[in-house]
Amino acid sequence: MAIRIAINGFGRIGRSVLRALYESGRRAEISVVAINELASAEGMAHLLKYDSSHGRFAWDVRQECDSLYVGDDIIRLIHQSEIEQLPWSELGIDVVLDCSGVYGSREDGEAHVASGAKKVLFAHPGGHDLDATVVYGVNHQDLRAEHRIVSNASCTTNCIIPIIQLLDIAYGIESGTVTTIHSSMNDQPVIDAYHQDLRRTRAASQSIIPVDTKLAAGITRIFPKFCDRFEAISVRVPTINVTAIDLSVSVTHPVGVAEVNQLLQKAARGAFRGIVDYTELPLVSMDFNHDPHSAIVDGTQTRVSGQHLIKTLVWCDNEWGFANRMLDTTLAMAKSGF
């Protein structure tokens, strides 16, 4: 029997999750029963069908009253601002995928559970008091039935954690720095406008904009031994999708470029197949749009200095890759038991 899910928040990630479910052929395993979103039903249907990053949705989409029709499937639409008022019990929801970007605390998760959901998966980093933070492919096997309120971490954490794990096991990481070169997001204005972060008052399409990031904290959340040993910075660039991450790590064991690339390529074809990919083609960011992997290593950009400093460039579709991991983690949560 398919897992019954509800999507709370139908923005970039919420819509990508729904599209990824249909495109990946996993509807026999996961059924979207309801979507809660404050926007109009007409707008929800339109943006599902037509997407500036991912193109037209292949399935027929129409909206009638409080229902969204996707092919032959009927999804109930809800427009409720209070989690406590959501009808998850009535709808028999197994897992809520909270893609709102607003909620992420233990209290928020408990509110979903109190409304009748068996489990909750946040599509962004949560607090330390959540039951688990999952990077699929690295620690999803640690999920237990009692883990009711879970975070899927962030798109950048999902991108870089598998690479860090591989390099650490092989060569022993001492410390590292990460620079995220991230596409612009909907918290940036089209033209200059007020924002509490003065850099984000500036037009997204006109500048490379440094922003705060909690990626270093995300790394230590998964690997506590790296506490105070990683630092991260982030810049937003004038593209609408796809992100690159520049990872530099100092390692204990001497190594060369060929060895690093061989390690990462082998992992992409083996243990991390479907999660990590590897390429040496002369590609640019748009070539990774709609790529379902969490991370794509660009082997042409690997560098090693003094045998102990490794630099890698890793791409990801920060929407599509993450949406696919949301589905993977949902299935892992269900497999762990309710």
From Swiss-Prot:
Involved pathway(s): Cofactor biosynthesis; pyridoxine 5'-phosphate biosynthesis; pyridoxine 5'-phosphate from D-erythrose 4-phosphate: step 1/5
Active site positions, chain numbering: 155
Binding site for substrate: 154-156, 200, 213-214, 236
Keywords (A to Z) from UniProt: Cytoplasm, NAD, Oxidoreductase, Pyridoxine biosynthesis
SUPFAM superfamilies: Glyceraldehyde-3-phosphate dehydrogenase-like, C-terminal domain, NAD(P)-binding Rossmann-fold domains
Activates thiol group during catalysis (site feature) positions: 182
Predominant cellular place of this UniProt entry's protein: cytoplasm
PROSITE patterns reported in the protein's UniProt record: GAPDH (PS00071)
Gene Ontology process terms (BP): glucose metabolic process; pyridoxal phosphate biosynthetic process; pyridoxine biosynthetic process
Keyword Transmembrane helix appears in the UniProt entry: no
Chain sites annotated for binding NAD(+): 12-13, 318
Subcellular location(s) of the protein: Cytoplasm
GO molecular-function term, one example from the UniProt record: NAD binding
Catalytic activity, EC: 1.2.1.72
Entry annotated with the keyword Ribosomal protein: no
Organism domain of life: Bacteria
GO CC annotation, single: cytosol
Catalytic activity line of the entry: D-erythrose 4-phosphate + NAD(+) + H2O = 4-phospho-D-erythronate + NADH + 2 H(+)
Family statement: Belongs to the glyceraldehyde-3-phosphate dehydrogenase family. Epd subfamily.
Subunit structure: Homotetramer.
Matches recorded under PANTHER family: GLYCERALDEHYDE-3-PHOSPHATE DEHYDROGENASE 2
Function field: Catalyzes the NAD-dependent conversion of D-erythrose 4-phosphate to 4-phosphoerythronate.
Protein name: D-erythrose-4-phosphate dehydrogenase
Organism lineage: Bacteria, Pseudomonadati, Pseudomonadota, Gammaproteobacteria, Enterobacterales
